[in-house]
């Protein structure tokens, strides 16, 4: 199985050459300014990709997932959106989480220490593929 991982495309996803693979993973900052319109274009782009499965998590620029979560999730029809949640595909257990330590005033920021640790403590021990926008400490 071939996993293809991309990140930080900032609405420039149509400008990159994506390698072939079985599962396409976008690990956040998929949007430029975080609008639903940008997200709709991203979902259309996901539909055009040949990968059997697509997985998406939000990053600190992906405001619509934080500010308009129901609307944002409804727009994603061609990928699995993970936010502190699991997904099992073809025998692999994935976990996706968008949280990063506070950095200026971006989306999905939590204070270092117990606040962010509480999110990362949710990650199951049997996770095969961990998808985060920033690396969790100690993993």
Residue ranges and their predicted role:
Residues 1-3:
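Extreme N-terminal starter segment of soluble prokaryotic enzymes
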Residues 6-89:
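Core catalytic region of metal-dependent phosphoesterases/phosphodiesterases
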Residues 21-23, 56, 92-139:
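Active-site-proximal loop/helix segment associated with metal-binding centers of metalloenzymes
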């Amino acid at each position: 199985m071939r996993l293809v991982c991309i990140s930080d495309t900032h609405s420039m996803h149509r400008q990159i050459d994506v390698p072939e693979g079985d599962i396409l993973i976008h690990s956040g900052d998929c949007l430029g300014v975080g609008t639903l319109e940008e997200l709709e274009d991203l979902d259309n782009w996901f539909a055009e990709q040949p990968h059997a499965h697509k997985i998406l998590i939000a990053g600190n620029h992906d405001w619509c997932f934080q500010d308009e979560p129901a609307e944002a999730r409804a727009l994603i029809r061609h990928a699995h959106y993970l936010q502190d949640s699991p997904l099992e595909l073809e025998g692999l257990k994935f976990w996706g989480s968008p949280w990063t330590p506070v950095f200026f005033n971006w989306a999905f920021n939590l204070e270092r220490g117990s606040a962010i640790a509480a999110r990362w403590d949710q990650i199951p021990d049997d996770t095969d593929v961990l998808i985060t926008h920033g690396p969790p400490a100690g993993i």
